Amino acid sequence: MIDPRYPLGPMPQPRDLSDDERQEARAALRALPGELRAAVAGLSEPQLDTPYREGGWTVRQVVHHVADRHLNAYVHTARVLSGGEALAQPAHEEAWAALPASSFATELSLLLLERLHIHWDEVLADVTDWQQAGLRPDGSEWTLDGLLGQAAWHGRHHTAHITRLREREGW
C-alpha cells in the first residue's frame, strides 16, 4: 500500500539535472497550475475542507501551501541569480497552515500559481549556469538544478494528494 503522505514516494534529494530532466521539470512547473486547478475542479466547500489523509492538511490548505512554497522557491531563484548570500527563510508550515488565510478561496492561490509559474519559467529560460547556488537556512548549498527538481516534484506530490483523495472518496 502506498504511504498517503508520499503518493509519489519520498522527496528526492537535490541533484544535478540533465538537459532533458531540466526541460521535463520546467514543463512540470508550467503544467502544475492547470493540473492543480483540474484536481480541485468541482469540489464542494466541505470537500475542499476535507483532509487528504488522517491528520493531514485539507485540500484547501494543500492548494494554499503549494502557492506559498512555490512563491518562496521563486524568491530563492531570484536570490541565487542576483548573488544573494542566503536563501529566504521559509515560513513555519504548520503554523502558517493554521492561520485564517488558509481558509481563503482556493482560486486566490490558483491565480497566483498561474501567474507566478509563467513568470518563473521566463526567468528560468535565461539561466545558463544551473550550478549557481544559494545557502539554505541550514547552511547547505542549493543549486538552481536542485531547486528546480524539487519544485517540480513538490507540485506533482501535492497534486497527487488531492487526486488520490478524490479516487478514494469517489469524487
Curated annotation (Swiss-Prot):
The molecular function terms in GO held by this entry are: hydrolase activity; zinc ion binding
GO cellular component assignments: cytoplasm
**Span list, region Disordered:** 1-23
- Cofactor remark from the record: Binds 1 zinc ion per subunit.
Q: What residues does Zn(2+) bind to?
A: H65, H154, H158
> Which cofactors go with this protein?
Zn(2+)
Instruction: Please state which protein family the record places this protein in.
Output: Belongs to the metal hydrolase YfiT family.
| Function in brief | Possible metal-dependent hydrolase.
Record note on quaternary structure: Homodimer.
Give the protein's recorded name: Putative metal-dependent hydrolase DR_1024
